[in-house]
């Protein structure tokens, strides 16, 4: 059996990037032989193994044959007679179809090194058209490698147009699209804009297509403050200007987690309260209530800090109101709900409206509305 370093790790090394993970392909081996050599299988229906010492992933070389629609519609062959070139040929782009053997020799049957040097994203083979996810991955690589300014090969653009006509993009799952979106957070504007240029955005992310202009420009995502943020923060910073009425649709489309959704919703509420000159006290009350930033002090603090971070990155926005006044308002409301009312003396059917009016009066006073 022979081992080859493949895929993104090789690409990144050739670009001068330290790879986060290293994936290996094994040629000339069976599953039983891998187990006999101490490798640990990690997938029930897929021959992927963990090296007993390095803990890196090793997969048997494979070929693929299209049998049905969608991302999973493939027949896979893991025979020990599959060659390295067979395995590399099934990969999406030439820059991902390069291998390095155990003697550090680069094996590049599809001229991926030339495309790396010329900053071109080019499909490895005509099989590119068989997997609709590859269109999304192409946009993701353009975003992920945005510092290198890759362009897409003309013949690949032509192939993508053919793929779109087949309707295959409609078979992509939200789970897979979420994974690609998160991986594209290095520069999501490039990710979505590339999909738009490929005429795929309206098919894959129709709601994002409607609010694309509200996502910051690509220079926003090149700011060190953004780059140093965690995934939860990056998602919120990217989508902070999404209208409240579109938020639930965006959540479903991007398959945002509860954590993502709560943080984004609270941050959007804070943004609107501080920036909207014409907002009313009742609208502010509904925003802070729906975003749960009265009860959840940690959520309020995290969202407010994230909004401050947004202002530092996007220095063209000047809030109409001081965030410290909002902080004082929230604290006053919390204390008022305990101290300013004798709840026992208020009829139950009037308690909710009485509390609501108290909060609105506090908002008016504190924010000078």
Swiss-Prot record:
Gene3D superfamilies named among the record's database cross-references: Beta Polymerase, domain 2, cca-adding enzyme, domain 2
Entry's EC annotation: 2.7.7.72
Tree of life domain: Bacteria
Catalytic activity field: a tRNA precursor + 2 CTP + ATP = a tRNA with a 3' CCA end + 3 diphosphate; a tRNA with a 3' CCA end + 2 CTP + ATP = a tRNA with a 3' CCACCA end + 3 diphosphate
Keyword Nucleotidyltransferase: yes
Binding of ATP, residues: 8, 11, 91, 137, 140
Cofactor names: Mg(2+)
Record has Coiled coil as a keyword: no
SUPFAM superfamilies membership: Nucleotidyltransferase, Poly A polymerase C-terminal region-like
Pfam families: PolyA_pol, PolyA_pol_RNAbd
Main enzyme class: transferase
Residues where Mg(2+) binds: 21, 23
GO biological process terms on file: RNA repair; tRNA 3'-terminal CCA addition
Amino acids binding CTP: 8, 11, 91, 137, 140
Keywords: ATP-binding, Magnesium, Metal-binding, Nucleotide-binding, Nucleotidyltransferase, RNA repair, RNA-binding, Transferase, tRNA processing
GO molecular function terms listed in the Swiss-Prot or TrEMBL record: ATP binding; CCA tRNA nucleotidyltransferase activity; magnesium ion binding; tRNA binding
Extra information: A single active site specifically recognizes both ATP and CTP and is responsible for their addition.
Similarity comment: family membership: Belongs to the tRNA nucleotidyltransferase/poly(A) polymerase family. Bacterial CCA-adding enzyme type 2 subfamily.
Known function: Catalyzes the addition and repair of the essential 3'-terminal CCA sequence in tRNAs without using a nucleic acid template. Adds these three nucleotides in the order of C, C, and A to the tRNA nucleotide-73, using CTP and ATP as substrates and producing inorganic pyrophosphate. tRNA 3'-terminal CCA addition is required both for tRNA processing and repair. Also involved in tRNA surveillance by mediating tandem CCA addition to generate a CCACCA at the 3' terminus of unstable tRNAs. While stable tRNAs receive only 3'-terminal CCA, unstable tRNAs are marked with CCACCA and rapidly degraded.
Name this protein carries in UniProt: CCA-adding enzyme
Species of origin: Francisella tularensis subsp. novicida (strain U112)
């Amino acid at each position: 059996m022979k081992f080859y370093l493949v895929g993104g790790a090789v690409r990144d090394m050739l670009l001068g990037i330290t790879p986060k993970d290293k994936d290996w392909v094994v040629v000339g081996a069976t599953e039983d032989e891998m187990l006999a050599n101490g490798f640990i299988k990690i997938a029930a229906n897929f021959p992927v193994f963990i090296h007993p010492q390095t803990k890196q992933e090793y997969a048997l070389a494979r070929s693929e044959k299209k049998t049905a629609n969608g991302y999973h519609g493939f027949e896979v062959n893991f025979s020990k007679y599959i060659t390295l070139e067979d395995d590399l040929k099934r990969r999406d782009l030439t820059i991902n179809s390069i291998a390095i053997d155990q003697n550090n020799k680069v094996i590049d049957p599809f001229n991926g090194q030339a495309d790396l040097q010329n900053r071109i994203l080019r499909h490895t083979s005509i099989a590119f058209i068989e997997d609709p996810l590859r269109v999304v991955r192409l946009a993701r690589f353009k975003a992920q490698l945005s510092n290198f300014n890759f362009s897409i090969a003309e013949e690949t653009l032509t192939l993508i147009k053919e793929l779109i006509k087949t309707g295959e993009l409609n078979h992509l799952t939200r789970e897979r699209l979420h994974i690609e979106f998160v991986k594209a957070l290095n520069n999501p504007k490039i990710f979505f804009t590339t999909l738009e240029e490929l005429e795929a955005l309206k098919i894959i992310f129709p709601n994002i297509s409607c609010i694309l202009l509200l996502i910051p420009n690509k220079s926003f995502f090149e700011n060190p403050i953004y780059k140093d943020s965690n995934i939860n923060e990056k998602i919120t910073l990217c989508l902070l200007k999404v209208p409240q009425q579109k938020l639930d649709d965006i959540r479903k489309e991007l398959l945002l987690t509860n954590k993502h959704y709560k943080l984004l919703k609270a941050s959007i509420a804070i943004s609107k309260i501080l920036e909207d000159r014409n907002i009313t006290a009742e609208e502010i009350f509904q925003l802070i209530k729906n975003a749960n930033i009265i009860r959840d002090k940690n959520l309020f603090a995290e969202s407010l800090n994230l909004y401050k971070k947004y202002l530092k990155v996007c220095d063209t926005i000047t809030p109409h109101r001081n965030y410290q006044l909002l902080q004082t308002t929230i604290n006053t409301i919390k204390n008022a709900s305990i101290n300013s009312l004798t709840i026992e003396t208020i009829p139950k059917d009037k308690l909710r409206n009485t509390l609501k009016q108290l909060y609105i009066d506090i908002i008016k006073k504190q924010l000078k509305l």
